[in-house]
Amino acid sequence: VVMNRKNLTAAVLAGLAGAAGIVGSAQAVNINPDGLGQVLIYPYYTVNGGNTTVLSVVNTTDYAKAVKVRFKEGKNSREVLDFNLYLSPYDVWTASIRNVDGTPTMKTADNSCTVPYIYGNDNDGNQAFLPWAMNDTGVADEYGPISRATEGYFEMIEMGVVTDDTEGSATSATHVDGMMDTCDNLVAAWSDPDDLDPDDNGYWYDDFLVDIDAPMGGLFGGAAVVNVQAGTMYTYDAKAINGFAESENPNFVPLHQPPGTSAPSLA
């Protein structure tokens, strides 16, 4: 399958405008030619043919940010990996996608906070793509092996600015001398250790909006498809979209959502 990256970006942008009911509005979502935005669309990744895809996202602001990271396979745009990324001010997060024994797998050696904490897991920063969303649709031609996910696209959505208003979340998300030792605080914020005891719930488990302000934009990203054996590298900048979430809009819906869910959505 050869994915048309320009058509994909145009289709997503049209869908955003239509869903928001702002077609023709001066405040409509728009692609920022400067590459900075609230939403980043990376139109293509592949691990086929010996290729590896490397990627990065940059927080160009002096605020900590909560970002939804979502990978979708190329056949029917089913989710294959979804997690939350918490960026320090002026942070850069990097990762790669490669083929590991037939399974597309993301690897990161970056200690920026994610929930779940992929860098700090017991698998050397590796996270295999998952087939669950491809197996529960009830539509026969949408079933298939994880090899469907060897190419696709991914998106990053700013869910909000992280603050220290009550729980010190921004401090937990911030590097100190290049190191992170507080990501467990953010993982715990989303956790429910004991279903029978509501008093031990994490603060985000109970209230998504604790220490979260409206998105402000300022994300920048890019990716490259690299084939070491062939000696090739194809690079691109992510398409940056502004106007996705306007806190002044009376219909504004807060975007900070749990990891592993379909919200917030560009659909």
At which residue positions do the language-model features occur?
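Asparagine-centered strand-capping/turn motif at beta-strand->loop junctions
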Residues: 57-63, 73
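Long, compositionally biased low-complexity segments
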Residues: 85-87, 96-267
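Short beta-strand/loop motifs in extracellular/secreted proteins, especially
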Residues: 53, 63-67, 250-251
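Short strand-edge motifs at loop-to-beta-strand transitions and within beta-strands
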Residues: 40, 93-95
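Gram-negative bacterial Sec-dependent N-terminal signal peptides
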Residues: 1-27
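Short beta-strand and strand-turn-strand segments in soluble, beta-rich domains
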Residues: 70-83
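A structural motif detector for short, solvent-exposed N-terminal "entry" segments of globular domains
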Residues: 28-58
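Beta-strand-rich interaction surfaces with strong enrichment in secreted/lumenal proteins
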Residues: 30, 82-85
